[in-house]
Amino acid sequence: VHLTADEKSAVTGLWGKVNVEEVGGEALGRLLVVYPWTQRFFESFGDLSNAGAVMGNAKVKAHGKKVLNAFSDGLKNLDNLKGTFAKLSELHCDKLHVDPENFRLLGNVLMIVLARHFGKEFCPPVQAAFQKVSLGVATALGHKYH
């Protein structure tokens, strides 16, 4: 992913304020509620029967944190996203059989959650920079599929 110096500064500056546990749990929870077919990958997480159950589910929150920690690794390795996410791409492709479109959906949900948490600070230029990173991460995660 190619970011200008300003974009890189905007992304790293805002990301330093992100509570990965809170934002990750909310982003994954929203993905599971808004796109319910994604729940099939999380059947072992227990009750996902309604929005309240999903958003309050401790396993969803914990996995959301794990997802955002991986995203953080990507932010530290923007010049090598493919390498950074190679093992996760292989896992999601070969073992979990996750549709790679779900990575893009999660990225879009993450944008909504960041906007909700950071309001005016998540202005259009910051969103544009995050969107680039998110798409780069989704593409890297989908790499094994090609």
From Swiss-Prot:
Modification type N-acetylvaline: residues: V1
PTM-bearing positions, type Phosphothreonine: T12
This protein's GO CC annotations: blood microparticle; haptoglobin-hemoglobin complex; hemoglobin complex
Modified residues (Phosphoserine): S44
Residue(s) carrying S-nitrosocysteine: C93
Keyword Magnesium: no
Modified residues (N6-acetyllysine): K59, K82, K144
Keyword RNA-binding: no
Top-level taxonomic group: Eukaryota
Record field: transmembrane: none
GO MF annotation list: haptoglobin binding; heme binding; hemoglobin alpha binding; metal ion binding; organic acid binding; oxygen binding; oxygen carrier activity; peroxidase activity
Keywords assigned: Acetylation, Heme, Iron, Metal-binding, Oxygen transport, Phosphoprotein, S-nitrosylation, Transport
InterPro entries given in the database record: Globin, Globin-like_sf, Globin/Proto, Hemoglobin_b, Hemoglobin_oxygen_transport
Tissues in which the UniProt entry reports expression: Red blood cells.
Primary role: Involved in oxygen transport from the lung to the various peripheral tissues.
Subunit and partners: Heterotetramer of two alpha chains and two beta chains.
Family of the protein in this entry: Belongs to the globin family.
Name this polypeptide is given: Hemoglobin subunit beta
Organism name: Antrozous pallidus (Pallid bat)
Gene: HBB
